[in-house]
Amino acid sequence: MKKYFLIGGLVTFVVIFNLGYVFHDLVMGDWFHDKEGDIAREELVLPAIALAFLIYVAIQAYFLHIFHTFAKAQYAWSLTRTALVFGALIGFLWDGLQGGLIEYATLKMPFEVFLVDSSYHTAEGALTALILSLFYRRYVGAP
């Protein structure tokens, strides 16, 4: 379990952190800045973003085991199916609902930014759990 957390968590963090940069800055950066206007920062606070992603990956890594144990016993779900559902749920709750909807409500963020960003983070959550599941399968031994 220790290797799963350390190696799986580190690799997942690196992939997801960099994918977030590619999506939010390289692919959609101009669109986000146009839509967000005055509420967008000129320079990102990367240490805060990295800390948030470290916590995010750690939470997913810890709770994937619990969620999979339950889903396997109750619904006979595979690890892959569990990872997709669990990851999408965490992605939506973590950033889509809690972050995105509150930002829309408090920062004059356009609703379309909430929709695009929340959709991305829901998919990102599923990908995070899928990557973790590969390491879980290898180091913990799930079928």
Task: Place the predicted regions along the sequence by residue.
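Juxtamembrane/disordered regions of integral membrane proteins
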Residues: M1-P143
